[in-house]
């Protein structure tokens, strides 16, 4: 907790990540927030602003905890239609961990778009195993009407939907479609976290807006995050960089943030962090983020072994296997350790 006028730290609280709780990591956020108020004598009515940074989007992509996305692409006919169909068929998207965001694809000519044809194509995607729908139309940034019609059909079915031209207003069908697919893949996990966190803040008696840190260092409200969670990629390191700029007043430096699942590395030069489009699995997106490199190895990383040798380290953390982190273990409990093998859940 910071004093809004002096930027002085007036309270803090640290809790373990609550992956096994029925509320997921949101339970830890709830506990940390409530502890920070009670342990530091802060009254709910004294809170004027809440900025929540989350590594949920980053961790979901690092660990492959993503949903299968059905892409309903739209565009012209003839040669231009062939090009649009090819550009919007992004295939399975490789993640840095070696896992994939699996996608399925169907194409509908823009002149044929209506409620009936959209319903048929969404059904085809569902039959192919999609649990989230991504709508993307060639030149959709000029008119979002058709993409919103797809979203309306997804809403009618109780499916989550990602609208490409609602995420980015930049041209480039392939990159815009890929961004929408990535956004859709993390929607289920992020929606649950957002709802639980918002409920917890309200139950604590705090009525001020709950703002979520974006990956570019800005903030957005909770409702925007529910539509565009992909913008929170690198939210955690963005918050740390902003903290370094504001509290430490660092003007030049190399920044490391070591968490449980990932380590983030960034540079502050002349008082400014670098900003660029985020890349997922080597593929560019239309998501502005701080120029931070994310490595899937950190304080809780598990060592992977096989064939009598160490194969790799990470990206899965010890908590995924139901284990604690060694850093929190009393030294006397790990004297003369014996080697044991565990598997992530």
Task: Describe each region flagged by the PLM.
Residues 1-345:
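N-terminally biased helix-coil "hinge/interface" segments that flank
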């Amino acid at each position: 907790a910071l004093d809004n006028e002096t930027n002085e730290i007036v309270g803090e609280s640290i809790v373990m990540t609550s992956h096994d709780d029925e509320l997921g990591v949101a339970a830890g956020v709830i506990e940390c927030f409530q502890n920070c108020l009670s342990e530091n004598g802060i009254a709910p009515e004294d809170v004027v602003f809440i900025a929540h940074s989350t590594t949920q989007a980053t961790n979901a992509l690092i660990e492959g905890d993503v949903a299968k996305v059905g892409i309903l692409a739209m565009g012209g006919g003839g040669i231009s239609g062939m090009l649009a169909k090819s550009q919007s068929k992004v295939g399975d998207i490789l993640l840095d961990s070696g896992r994939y965001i699996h996608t399925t694809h169907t194409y509908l000519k823009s002149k044929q778009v209506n409620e009936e044809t959209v319903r048929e194509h969404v059904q085809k995607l569902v039959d192919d195993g999609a649990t989230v729908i991504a709508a993307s139309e060639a030149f959709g940034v000029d008119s979002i009407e058709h993409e919103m019609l797809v979203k309306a059909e997804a809403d009618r079915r109780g499916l989550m939907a990602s609208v490409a031209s609602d995420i980015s207003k930049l041209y480039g069908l392939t990159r815009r479609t890929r961004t929408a697919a990535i956004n859709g893949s993390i929607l289920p996990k992020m929606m649950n976290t957002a709802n639980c966190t918002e409920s917890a803040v309200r139950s604590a008696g705090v009525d001020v807006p709950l703002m979520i840190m974006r990956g570019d260092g800005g903030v957005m409200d909770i409702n925007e995050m529910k539509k565009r969670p992909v913008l929170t990629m690198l939210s955690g390191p963005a918050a740390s960089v902003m903290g370094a700029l504001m509290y430490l007043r660092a003007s030049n430096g190399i920044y490391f943030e070591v968490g449980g699942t990932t380590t983030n590395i960034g540079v502050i030069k002349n008082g400014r962090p670098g900003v660029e489009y985020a890349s997922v699995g080597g593929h560019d997106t239309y998501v502005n983020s701080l120029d931070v490199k994310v490595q899937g190895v950190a304080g809780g990383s598990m060592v992977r072994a096989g064939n009598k040798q160490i194969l790799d380290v990470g990206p899965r953390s010890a908590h995924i296997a139901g284990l604690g982190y060694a850093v929190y273990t009393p030294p006397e409990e790990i004297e003369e350790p014996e080697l044991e093998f565990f598997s992530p859940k």
